[in-house]
Every structure is written in C-alpha cells, then in structure tokens.
Design a protein with these regions (language model features):
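Short, ordered secondary-structure scaffold segments
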Residues: 2-51, 57, 94-170
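Repeat-solenoid scaffold signature
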Residues: 59-90
Length: 170
C-alpha cells in the first residue's frame, strides 16, 4: 500500500503522491495520479501547487519556510539563529514563540494587522515602531534540568501535566 524511493523516501500511499527536491526536501504532496517523468521537462510545472495539494518551500539551510494547504492558504515560518521556530503566520494571525534554551517558555498570538514594523533610528539602532502585542499568552513550566513539561499556564488558569517515566504526557 506504500512505495518508497531512494533513501527511504515515501513516494506514494493509498491517497497521496510525494515529490522531493534535489536536497531530499518534500516539495509536493498531491492526490494527482499522473505526472511527468523527469525527462519530460515539465516537472517544475507539475510541482506547482494546485487546489487539493500541499506544497512546501524550504530555506537554504533546510528549514521549512512555508506550507501551502489544499485550500490555498499559506502558513509561513521564521526561525532564530539557533534554528528554533520563533514565528508562524497563518490566516491573519501571528503566532510567536519564546525559548529558554531548548524548551518553549512562552507562546502567544495576535492579529497580523497589529504587527509592529522594524525601523532604523537616526542613530542606526534597529527597533520596532511600537511594542509587539501579546494576546493569549501561554507559559510552559518544565521539570528542573529536563525537557519534560510539568505545567501550562494560560491567563489565570494553571494546568498540571502528568508524564510517564520517559517524559511523555499521559
């Protein structure tokens, strides 16, 4: 019910076909059952997003830049210098992530229209033209010296997270 290509890449399952770029990144997930061979010269046209497809774009460093969904809406991602996702933009909302080392400390979102602009002051300082909004703030609490979450704080509500012996929430 599945077929795989070189390097174990999933090529086809019962519902989808998968296409990859020369770096091994998934670029298209489609239900279309016919496509050109590599020799036809039409591969790039075929790999362009069409309704019903998932299309993926990648940064030069292998980080996911965007996903275009079957409904045509696009989700975009930004990362910090350490490769941690710091932003997701989708459907008019900006979702932000603040990290403490290797774990997410805070996440929040706000309307994309409220996003502050980056400006350069007369002294050459790069800053924002207004404070970034913080709505729907979520704070994560972790077991000391581990990556296992123990609590989630949303507004004035506190939730405990119970995990098994290997750190999976139960």
């Amino acid at each position: 019910d599945r077929s795989y290509g070189r390097g174990g890449q999933l090529r086809e399952d019962k519902k989808w076909r998968y296409y990859y770029d020369s770096h091994g990144n998934l670029v298209l997930k489609t239900m279309r059952r016919s496509g050109p061979s590599l020799e036809t010269g039409m591969r790039d046209e075929f790999l362009a997003w069409q309704s019903g497809d998932y299309a993926y774009t990648w940064q030069g460093n292998g980080m996911l830049r965007s996903v275009t969904r079957p409904d045509g809406k696009t989700v975009t991602f930004r990362y910090d210098a350490l490769g941690r996702r710091i932003e997701k933009v989708f459907d008019g909302r900006v979702y932000r992530y603040l990290w403490d080392g290797d774990v997410i400390l805070h996440e929040w979102d706000y309307a994309e229209a409220d996003r502050p602009n980056t400006i350069v002051t007369e002294t050459g300082e790069v800053t924002l033209d207004r404070p970034e909004p913080v709505e729907n703030l979520i704070t994560w609490v972790y077991d000391s010296d581990s990556y296992v979450p123990t609590a989630k704080i949303v507004g004035d509500k506190h939730y405990s997270i119970i995990s098994d012996y290997i750190g999976r929430p139960v």
